[in-house]
Swiss-Prot record:
Not sulfated on tyrosine residue(s). Its EC number is 3.4.21.4. Residues 24-244 form the Peptidase S1 domain. It comes from Bos taurus. Ca(2+) binds at residues 75, 77, 80, 85. The active site is at 63 (charge relay system), 107 (charge relay system), 200 (charge relay system). Pfam families: Trypsin. GO terms for cellular component: extracellular region; extracellular space. Residues 1-15 form the signal peptide. It is found in: Secreted, Extracellular space. It is an enzyme of class 3 (hydrolase). One of its GO terms (biological process) is proteolysis. This is Anionic trypsin.
Length: 247
């Protein structure tokens, strides 16, 4: 378990019984090169996901913060070197100034790459949202997180899950008193499909735009407890202003 992830989840122990909420349960193995904006954050091991939004910036979750991060782009099987991967150290790691490790509000992080990524068939960018997505929108969630709701199985190959965004009312009803206006829920109230440990920071892509960041949840794929995601449409101005100030 990673110390800053412990901090994030101890802060809300009732809601976050596990160390880092970043896996896919009930999904499928993504087709190779089908999620070229997905990155792996590495500190000698994969610990979180992220999304490439331009050739030098990645969006992830603030609770994924570590002092030193290597961003791995073009990954599919994270257990082997396949050729075409790009490993680039972070030169700046910027958490949202109002991030709360207690509530996980404003759970968003920007990473500047030390050198620009080379955009190609394996590595490309995901657009920021032009507007907030509505409930019912089908989205693609991806990551290398745990694939079991009970037990542990971390896959080598990138996993995908198609899931709908839920209404704010359903989200609040699932987690009374814990959902802020900066959070969205996605998934299935009946359970069985969800993100989980190892997927944190990864993308929720809806109609070609980054609408969510894997943030937290109660367990994984539990009935009545959908995944909770950072609502990226609330942060477009902050992202653009932060990039401009650190270019």
């Amino acid at each position: 378990m990673h110390p800053l992830l412990i901090l994030a989840f101890v802060g809300a122990a009732v809601a976050f019984p596990s160390d880092d909420d970043d896996k896919i349960v009930g999904g499928y193995t993504c087709a190779e090169n089908s999620v070229p904006y997905q990155v792996s954050l590495n500190a000698g091991y994969h610990f979180c996901g992220g999304s490439l939004i331009n050739d030098q910036w990645v969006v992830s979750a603030a609770h994924c913060y570590q002092y030193h991060i290597q961003v791995r782009l073009g990954e599919y099987n994270i257990d082997v070197l396949e050729g075409g991967e790009q490993f680039i150290d972070a030169s700046k790691i910027i958490r949202h100034p109002k991030y709360s490790s207690w509530t996980l509000d404003n759970d968003i992080l920007l990473i500047k790459l030390s050198t620009p990524a080379v955009i190609n068939a394996r590595v490309s960018t995901l657009l920021l949202p032009s507007a907030c997505a509505s409930a019912g929108t089908e989205c693609l969630i991806s990551g290398w997180g745990n694939t079991l709701s009970s037990g542990v199985n971390y896959p080598d190959l990138l996993q995908c899950l198609v899931a709908p965004l839920l209404s704010h009312a359903d989200c609040e009803a699932s987690y009374p008193g814990q959902i802020t206006n900066n959070m969205i829920c996605a998934g299935f109230l009946e359970g069985g499909k969800d993100s989980c440990q190892g997927d944190s920071g990864g993308p929720v892509a809806c109609n070609g735009q980054l609408q969510g960041i894997v943030s937290w949840g109660y367990g994984c794929a539990q009935k009545g407890k959908p995944g909770v995601y950072t609502k990226v449409c609330n942060y477009v101005d902050w992202i653009q202003e932060t990039i401009a100030a650190n270019s």
